[in-house]
Amino acid sequence: MKINNIKIVFYKSNYRWWSRLIKWWTNSSYSHCELYINNTYLVGISNEQSVRCKKYDLSSEKWDSIELKIDNKLEWIVNDFFEKTQGAKYDWKAIILSNIFNRRLQNTNKYTCSEWIAELLDLRYNIFQPKKYYMLTPQDVYDVFSKNELIE
């Protein structure tokens, strides 16, 4: 897909009970994150429980966003990573064992929303240390990118 603009978007609404629970548990403003490409496509791991790309009309009342500077390398990485992970399932085990029970376990073939975003963007920017993406929350991703010069 040709990418003209790309944003990391963070779900801030309390529409669903699990959004409130996630925000409370992680002491965060956000319960979910994905990429928003060309102001049209929501890309990432979703409520549908797998990595997908779908047309979506984003509401600024429900989502905050950070626009990234687009370049050829980022465009290639996004397309390549999406192609490799498309259809990968949501990693509920990592959420429960790593974020609730602090067991630091994950399935490398499954992702949480923030894990998928962090791993993809770290291929371009190399800014997450240590590389334990499965331990990150949407708020962690927001904090890293809102404090860097990688945004427009």
Q: What is each stretch, according to the model?
A:
Residues 1, 48, 52-53, 64-73, ...:
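Extracellular cell-wall/glycan-interacting regions and their flexible linkers
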Residues 1-12:
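Extended, non-globular alpha-helical segments
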Residues 10-69, 97-105:
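Glycine-rich catalytic cores of cysteine/serine-nucleophile enzymes that process amide/ester linkages
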Residues 17-20, 73-81, 140:
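Exposed alpha-helical structural elements
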Residues 27-30, 71, 75, 110, ...:
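Solvent-exposed, acidic/flexible segments
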Residues 74-95:
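A structural motif
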Residues 99-152:
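Activation targets extended, charge/polar-rich intrinsically disordered C-terminal tails
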